[in-house]
Amino acid sequence: MKIDLHNHSYYSDGFLSPSEVVLLAKKEGCDVFSLTDHDTTDGLIEAQQQADKLDLKLIHGVEISAMWSNMTIHILGLGIDINNETLQKGLKQHQEFRQLRAEKMARGLGGAGVFGALEKVKLVAKKGMITRTHFAQMLVQEGVCKDMRSVFKRFLTGKKPGGVGGKWAEYDEVIGWIHAAGGKAVLAHPLRYRMTNTKVRRLLNHLSGADLDGVEVVTGSSSSDEITLVSQWAKEFDLLSSIGSDYHGWPNQRVRIGHLQDMPQVNEMVWKDSSWLN
């Protein structure tokens, strides 16, 4: 059975529509699939309609930014009720911050000689939510930088011209939103943060103490050694294991839906004791 529980559409920083993402998931052989846009569930109704046509099991999801030790992390909410008031109230706060952040980023880029950044990035972001990925893609398309890596290095991190710090809800609050909506809270891509392995272990220890349910053991960019390491951490902190490609669909990105290494069979899966596989 092919399962992919971390993917994006153009309702956040993905390239394709929800329908197109679901259609591609079916084409790539997925049996169970989740759409997990950043801080929004707006694409899930369209995704569900397409999944029903294709007889594909869709798990309603979201990827929520959160603060831990003054650092931004991402927590997936899987199997959520998208009509839950607590969840939607929290997501609205984040959406409002994203708009303010985009305006600040554009002003910073203007000061560095990239003029009209906000107007240009709006043409890249198809559904209103503007993310750092949209700014990065815009700067590549404008020929300011040659690739995404150089954009972030020159413009979008730390004290660079377009670097704007996060002001997200704290991790325990975000976990609470997800649980209020009946979902599983899963730390996304634990090895992608700018942390040493020792610090990631401390992160997992803190989050597991705040009732985190699971951790993403397998991602679309994971090496075998990374999978083994995160699998060990999942067992150490009594966390369920999840799997997801983190597909965005931009032409200059290599990750593909459903093309994932195998999950270690010694781990308990995040879909344990759920109806997700029915």
Per-region residue spans from a language model:
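Acidic, carboxylate-rich catalytic segments that either coordinate divalent cations
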Residues: H259
